Amino acid sequence: TEIGAVRSPEDVWFDEYGNLVWTVKDPDDGIPDDKKRIIYFDGHTDTVRALRDQWHQKTDGSIDAYDGVLKLNGLAHDFLRGELGYLPPDDEWDNLIFGRGSADQLGGVISQIIATKIALELVKEGALKGTIIRAYATTAEEDNDGAGPMYLMNKVLPGSGPELVPDVVILSEGTGDAGKGALGIYRGQRGRMQIEVTVT
């Protein structure tokens, strides 16, 4: 509530798995919750291993996994371009955030917080009319292949009312598209299948 991303402290909590959950809606729009559209935001709060020594070595000491950019002069542009696929123009580097999870994936979680704040600021203009935003900052995605969201799919949503089941899902995972620049929006799903094969 301090930054205005929810109406009240009751609108934000940790679920039993440890996912941070917050909701926003317009309680005065005259539409019952079970008739509203549900927009689901999801972003994860964990990151992969830092590999601090490797990054420090491969960037000639110009980047530290925890401290960010240590020196812009002599930054290993070729290495970074190879790792990231895209580098912004040099005159934009002062506006970048470097550090653990800044791109994967805390920047996305921050965008969810800002989106709900803006939606609440625009409630008088109808931004939330007939809509509930359910936002999640989930855990255990990097190291457990999506265990935080799977908790929702397996434990929260089955048998729940329509006020919980999403009509649309927005994943705030940074996608990027080196051909288009630093940002890109992807629609769809990469897909996944788990199968067990028994050979006799």
What do these predicted regions represent?
Residues 188-198:
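Eukaryotic endomembrane system proteins
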Residues 1-102, 122-131:
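Acidic/His- and Gly-rich active-site-bordering loop/insert found
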Residues 17, 36, 165, 192-194:
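Sequence-level motif detector for i,i+2 pairs with an aromatic at +2
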Residues 20, 133-135, 195:
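Hydrophobic residues positioned within well-ordered beta-strands of beta-sheet architectures
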